[in-house]
From Swiss-Prot:
One GO cellular component term: cytoplasm
Provenance organism: Rattus norvegicus
Subunit structure: Interacts with CNOT7 and CNOT8.
Phosphoserine modification, residue list: 159
Similarity-based family: Belongs to the BTG family.
Record PROSITE patterns: BTG_1 (PS00960), BTG_2 (PS01203)
Biological processes per GO annotation: cell population proliferation; negative regulation of cell population proliferation; positive regulation of angiogenesis; positive regulation of endothelial cell differentiation; positive regulation of fibroblast apoptotic process; positive regulation of myoblast differentiation; response to oxidative stress; response to peptide hormone
Keywords for this protein: Phosphoprotein
Protein name (Swiss-Prot/TrEMBL): Protein BTG1
Family annotation (Pfam families): BTG
The protein's role, per its UniProt record: Anti-proliferative protein.
InterPro entries per record: Anti_prolifrtn (IPR002087), BTG (IPR033332), BTG-like_sf (IPR036054)
């Protein structure tokens, strides 16, 4: 099998996890129909697969990580914007539906995110590299994020609370 097809096959789970995560924000706000959500998800999956196809390196998962990073920070990620346009969502509507600061890393074998510049990094998806070349031998598991990360999502925070005490130790 051609190496590109092997690489492309391995990114399916990672892309699906990232798209599902982003789509949940649209679903939670209830401003899109189920059909619009499906169209958005399918479009975003196709856009990400095309965008990543020459930047996916299962043998070196960190290589190309910056290129694959999905980022919202005062600017909308262009791929999310394109998928949203296909269902008629304007940039303004999209900014209301998604966190104002979101970083989503889509890497071979792991998808993780951070909401806010100071937020915790939470893992959405993990997989172990396959021993052989078969996709079936890959141990895949969706990770149920830590409670603190879930709470950030449910509370709609863009940054963690600054109400904390810092402990210092001097020797």
């Amino acid at each position: 099998m051609h190496p590109f097809y092997t690489r492309a096959a391995t990114m399916i789970g990672e892309i699906a996890a990232a798209v599902s995560f982003i789509s949940k924000f649209l679903r939670t706000k209830g401003l899109t129909s189920e059909r619009q959500l499906q169209t958005f998800s399918q479009s975003l999956q196709e856009l990400l697969a095309e965008h990543y196809k020459h930047h996916w390196f299962p043998e070196k998962p960190c290589k190309g990580s910056g290129y694959r990073c999905i980022r919202i920070n005062h600017k909308m990620d262009p791929l999310i914007g394109q998928a949203a346009q296909r269902i008629g969502l304007s940039s303004q509507e999209l900014f209301r539906l998604l966190p104002s600061e979101l970083t989503l890393w889509v890497d071979p074998y792991e998808v993780s995110y951070r909401i806010g510049e100071d937020g915790s990094i939470c893992v959405l998806y993990e997989a172990s590299p396959a021993g052989g070349s078969s996709q079936n031998s890959t141990n895949v598991q969706m990770v149920d994020s830590r409670i603190s990360c879930k709470e950030e999502l449910l509370l709609g925070r863009t940054s963690p609370s600054k109400n904390y005490n810092m402990m210092t130790v001097s020797g």
